[in-house]
Amino acid sequence: MRPLDENLRTSAASRPAQSLSVRGQPEAESGAFGEAIADAGRRRTQGQGGRTSADDPRRDSVANGGNASAVPKADGFGADVPASMADAASPDARPASERAITTRDQAAKRLQHGHPAGTTPLSLGRDGAGEETAEPVEPAAAHSRETVHALRDAIDEASGMTATEGDENAEPVGGTVSDLLSMLTGAAPAVAAALQPEGRAKPASAVRDGSDGPAKAVGGISPDVADGAHPQTGDGTGGSEPDRLFRFARADGKGQVVSMSISRDGERAVVENSRSSVKPGVETVTVLEARRYLGLAVNENATSVTTAIAGDSGWAEALQSSAATTKPEAWSQAGKTLNTLKIQMHPVDLGMVTATLRLKDDELQVDLKVETGEAFRQLRDDQSEMVKALRAQGFAVDQVNIVFNGGGDSASGGGGQSQAQAQLGYEGRERAGDDGQGRQPRDGGRAATERWAGNDATDDVPDGAERSRAGHVYM
């Protein structure tokens, strides 16, 4: 901008009157209009602090906003009016705060209008060939994006006005920028909901933090619970399953009752001796027998004798017993302690189950005895799972022996068979008695006949008597 003329720096009253002629008209004094222009130019000069610029006034006017009123013009008296005087009367000479407020109002109106009615907003995307294509998007997403762009442009405009305004009297626009930022923060949940493709929208706190994961719990309460949503558990049943409680007691009622709590996954077990009361849901395990057999250690004398015998093949074959031949592992079991445990359980779905456990070092042998066919089938199907569970506890288990004990059925069947045999024996004895009574007179007659045959005819009668005796069975 060009510096003002020296005559404009002086007051209008002290300046000598200038004669202006327009198209040969006589000279006339400048009126109130000229004095107003001169006063405005002086105020503008004092505000800028005597700044000067070597650039062209037209270029400065375009850089300040492209306002046509900033270009030097000719006044009604034929003289050029300086650009600074024209800028003083232009609307851009308002304070920066007023211009920022105006910009914010314009941005708010732009947000309210949005897209015209009946139009579908489009989003730019790239197809497989890499070319940009326009695809329709959801109205909420398009409106949210338009909101963000409008607010960002408004902030840039306000910041640009603050940066270009170099006057010392310029007012700060921090409040305006804060208002725009608050509007942007308020629009953040809508933007997050629009940009979320599927599933549940991200919480507002995650959007503000710039994180992709769920919002962190504050005060032990997660945002989902605070919003009223029900938290999901890992198993989907609404809660973890309780531990199973077992109560061990002797069959004769003596000794102390031991309670064991085992987690559902079998990873944790707690044994307590003080819990002796029977509670609902507790499975009772009756201990029938618990013994411990101490193995006999082989002394030095026995070892030396055994070594000498084993060195002679003849003695070894002669003294080797049949037990050692059939069970060669029996020699290696010397000196080991054997623990046996026999328990009885009453599961609801299996009936009575008797388990016999034999533990020697880490080797465990399990025998299960059941009384129903359904229990036998279920345990046989779960045999491999039981072996895996015992091996996970550190035991060396080859297999679990399951025995079907139909003792009750066989006993009842044997009793019926013995009763039938007794009844048949009683009937046989009755028939034998009847036969004896009928044969007694015949035997008496046969004896008389034999005696008579012995006296008179000894040739034919003895042969007939022998034939008759050969066909009878005597009890």
From Swiss-Prot:
Species name: Rhizobium meliloti
This protein is called: Chemotaxis protein MotD
Alphabetically sorted, this entry's keywords are: Chemotaxis, Cytoplasm, Flagellar rotation
Q: Where in the cell is it found?
A: Cytoplasm
- Keyword Chloroplast in the entry? The reply is no
UniProt biased composition (Low complexity)? 79-100
* Polar residues bias spans: 9-22
Region (Disordered) residue spans: 1-175, 195-243, 408-475
Report any one BP term from Gene Ontology.
archaeal or bacterial-type flagellum-dependent cell motility
- Function comment: Required for the rotation of the flagellar motor. Has a positive effect as flagellar rotation increases when an excess of motd is present.
Family annotation (CDD domains) = T3SS_Flik_C
Chain's gene name: motD
Q: What are the Gly residues biased-composition ranges?
A: 408-417
